[in-house]
Amino acid sequence: MILPIFVVCFILFLCLCIFLRPLVLSISIYAWLLVLVLLLWVSVGSALRIFFCYLIFLYIPMMCINFHAQYLTQQD
């Protein structure tokens, strides 16, 4: 029950991060995503599921935000 709500909030926040130009604001929004991930971890359980959640919801989006920031700095 909690997973679909989490995924919808995650996608909305991540899209918001992509469209925000200031990097500090983007990271601030992403910090709220980290809070959502912590709430999800409480309900997930096994170590393998937690690893995949970490990979999908933390590592890959942070890498995308980093690439987005590098792209913005090269554009200016």
Swiss-Prot record:
InterPro entries: Papilloma_E5_alpha (IPR004270). Keywords: Early protein. Pfam families: Papilloma_E5. Belongs to the papillomaviridae E5 protein family. This is Probable protein E5. The gene is E5.
